């Protein structure tokens, strides 16, 4: 089972719970929409652990749940704990936490990123703008800063081969003290990205963990050793939750993809908040989803849809504003 809550839409959040057959894990491919079944699609102003723990048993026999995949949100993890469910930490979020723990207070890293910010601010509109570094993420900055080091590698290669103008070489002179740090960090990030891709496609097992760790066999810098130590701890935790010779899924990327698809559909009118249009998520999941959706649209009555809406969506932000304006109109008139 995969769970997550959406980002804030207006004043509400959407809880999405997906069921995944164990048989589709470890088939040399990442999960797809056809592998999923929607269990819960419900809106609330907030989702506390108690709310989630009460909701899950209403939709599935807990004995059917082998494990739950999610990020490390306290509301989700506490809900799993109260229901005695195994929690598998999503590999993407876990790797992000590992990277953060190693680099957040690293002097070289902080000085390098500050230097890039200053360089970008000074040169983005100049005649040497072609060599300006990419923007840094503000939110979840440790989930993907590979582009910053990829850019650094490219600039060093151009400098080493005298392919830049004198002005560009002078502007990039600040990179010299970070040369070895850039190369080492880039190698760490490339290996982590490859490891993540391998685990998303092949799932986690003790055998796959050994193969994944082999990607770091030739790395022995201080930062890489710190990364390896935490990876081993993460894999040990997953191993303790995995039955012998079994492969489990360890990525919740697919649920993030569902939210992204929904956001793309409603992006033109976010002020409405979360409406029954979120049913588009359920419509795009499962096998033969097109035929099933067509059948549902032809057979489900509006009365039933309104009942579902009242129970799971309640009033949208747009409806609340409309109601308030109606009250205001009565006073003005």
Language-model segments: which ranges?
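A catalytic-pocket lid/entrance helix-loop region that shapes and gates access to the active site
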Residues: 105-116
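Acidic/histidine-rich catalytic cores and adjacent linkers
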Residues: 73-82, 95, 120-333
């Amino acid at each position: 089972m995969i769970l997550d809550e959406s980002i804030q839409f207006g004043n509400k959040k959407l809880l999405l719970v997906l069921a995944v057959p164990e048989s589709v894990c470890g088939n040399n491919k990442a999960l797809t929409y056809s592998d999923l079944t929607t269990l819960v699609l419900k809106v609330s102003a907030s989702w506390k652990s108690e709310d989630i723990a009460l909701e899950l048993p209403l939709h599935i026999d807990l004995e059917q749940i082998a494990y739950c995949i999610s990020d490390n949100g306290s509301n989700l993890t506490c809900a799993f704990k109260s229901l005695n469910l195994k929690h598998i930490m999503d590999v993407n979020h876990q790797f992000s936490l590992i990277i953060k723990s190693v680099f957040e207070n690293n002097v070289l890293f902080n000085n390098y990123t500050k230097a890039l910010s200053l360089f970008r601010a000074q040169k983005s509109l100049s005649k040497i703008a072609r060599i300006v570094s990419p923007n840094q993420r503000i939110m979840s900055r440790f989930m993907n800063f590979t582009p910053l080091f990829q850019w650094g590698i490219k600039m060093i290669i151009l400098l080493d081969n005298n392919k830049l103008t004198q002005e560009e070489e002078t502007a990039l002179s600040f990179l010299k003290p970070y040369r070895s740090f850039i190369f080492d960090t880039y190698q760490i990030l490339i290996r982590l990205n490859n490891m993540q891709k391998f685990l998303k496609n092949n799932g986690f097992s003790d055998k796959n963990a050994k193969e994944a760790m082999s990607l770091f066999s030739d790395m022995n810098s201080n930062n890489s050793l710190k990364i390896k130590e935490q990876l081993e701890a993460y894999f040990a935790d997953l191993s303790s939750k995995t039955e012998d010779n079994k492969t489990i899924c360890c990525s919740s990327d697919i649920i993030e993809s569902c939210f992204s698809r929904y956001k793309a559909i409603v992006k033109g009118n976010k002020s409405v908040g979360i409406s029954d249009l979120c049913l588009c998520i359920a419509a795009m999941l499962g096998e033969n989803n097109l035929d099933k959706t067509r059948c549902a649209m032809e057979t489900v009555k509006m009365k039933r849809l309104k009942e579902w809406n009242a129970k799971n969506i309640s009033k949208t932000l747009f409806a609340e504003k409309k109601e308030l304006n109606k009250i205001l109109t009565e006073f003005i008139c």
